[in-house]
């Protein structure tokens, strides 16, 4: 790795490194998508190489699968392994009960499928993602291409009847074109400002024709690992009801970090 890490990269680095500590030999592990998850994949590859671990990975996106294979991790499909011991992923927001908004990286559908098919979900993040109430980060909704504008209108009309602060729905763009997911769908980002009842919002969205899935991850996350720029991490375990601090060594010197 060249140069000094920025404070935010240092926070992501230590969160990802600590989360890899949950992985044990012989596990089937789900690999998340996004900038923080990419740090985790690199840490995992380094740990597997140094400790001679035998693990099987399932990726939540094409780009995560490519990174993992480049780093010599064994990547297979969810259909092949059927169920996972652990999934490690990032989040765009999390609240005090560890409910999440995910999908900023465009992989929410596969991320939710993989996380739901896991015994445990570990989320790696930094303190900026902690909120009292979900909704400041736009909520991604994956929609079928056919009739997407009608679907967007239905979404906005439906939001009139739920407890949210805003209703603007914007098609996600990339390089001047609609962003296309790995499944060939579009994403509509909902600028809700505040989600008073996440369960209600998730339920009504997924009942609409044309909606594939939304980025609310409710009762899925077990542990959040919050990285900090001083090299410390905070672990919040929703099942144990515990919160504790640890210090993580920051030494990004392995070959898996050489291109950063």
Curated annotation (Swiss-Prot):
Positions annotated as active site in the UniProt record: 111 (proton acceptor)
Keywords linked to the UniProt accession: Isomerase
Biological process annotations from GO: D-ribose metabolic process; pentose-phosphate shunt, non-oxidative branch
Isomerase as UniProt keyword: yes
SUPFAM superfamilies found in the cross-reference section: D-ribose-5-phosphate isomerase (RpiA), lid domain, NagB/RpiA/CoA transferase-like
Pfam families reported in the protein's UniProt record: Rib_5-P_isom_A
Pathway(s) annotated for this protein in UniProt: Carbohydrate degradation; pentose phosphate pathway; D-ribose 5-phosphate from D-ribulose 5-phosphate (non-oxidative stage): step 1/1
Binding annotation for substrate: 33-36, 89-92, 102-105, 129
A single cellular component GO annotation: cytosol
InterPro entries linked to this entry: NagB/RpiA_transferase-like, Ribose5P_isomerase_typA_subgr, Ribose5P_isomerase_type_A
Catalytic activity: aldehydo-D-ribose 5-phosphate = D-ribulose 5-phosphate
UniProt-recorded Gene Ontology molecular function terms: ribose-5-phosphate isomerase activity
Disulfide partners: none
CDD domains (UniProt xref): RPI_A (cd01398)
Main EC class the enzyme belongs to: isomerase
Enzyme Commission number, as recorded: 5.3.1.6
Quaternary structure (record): Homodimer.
Function: Catalyzes the reversible conversion of ribose-5-phosphate to ribulose 5-phosphate.
Record family assignment: Belongs to the ribose 5-phosphate isomerase family.
Protein name: Ribose-5-phosphate isomerase A
Top-level taxonomy: Bacteria, Pseudomonadati, Pseudomonadota, Alphaproteobacteria, Rhodobacterales
Gene: rpiA
């Amino acid at each position: 790795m060249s140069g000094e890490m920025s404070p935010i990269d240092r926070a992501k680095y230590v969160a990802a490194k600590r989360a890899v500590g949950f992985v044990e030999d012989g596990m089937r592990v789900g690999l998340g998508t996004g900038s923080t998850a990419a740090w985790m994949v690199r840490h995992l590859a380094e740990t597997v190489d140094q400790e001679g671990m035998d693990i099987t990975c399932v990726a939540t996106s094409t780009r995560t699968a490519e990174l993992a294979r480049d780093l010599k991790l064994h990547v297979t499909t969810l259909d092949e392994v059927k169920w996972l011991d652990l999934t490690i992923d990032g989040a765009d927001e999390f609240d005090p009960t560890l409910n999440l908004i995910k999908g900023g990286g465009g992989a929410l559908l596969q991320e939710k499928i993989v996380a739901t098919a896991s015994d445990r979900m570990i989320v790696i993040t930094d303190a900026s993602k902690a909120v009292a109430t979900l909704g400041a980060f736009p909520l991604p909704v994956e929609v079928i291409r056919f009739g997407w504008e009608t679907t967007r209108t239905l979404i906005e009309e439906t939001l009139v009847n739920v407890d949210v602060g805003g209703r603007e729905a914007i098609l996600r763009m990339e390089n001047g074109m609609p962003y296309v997911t790995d499944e060939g769908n579009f994403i509509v980002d909902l600028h809700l400002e505040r989600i008073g009842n996440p369960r209600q919002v998730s339920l009504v969205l997924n009942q609409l024709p044309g909606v594939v899935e939304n980025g609310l991850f409710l009762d899925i996350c077990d542990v959040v690992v919050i990285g900090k720029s001083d090299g410390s991490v905070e672990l919040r375990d929703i099942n144990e009801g515990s919160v504790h601090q640890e210090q993580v060594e920051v030494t990004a010197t392995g070959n898996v970090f050489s291109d950063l």
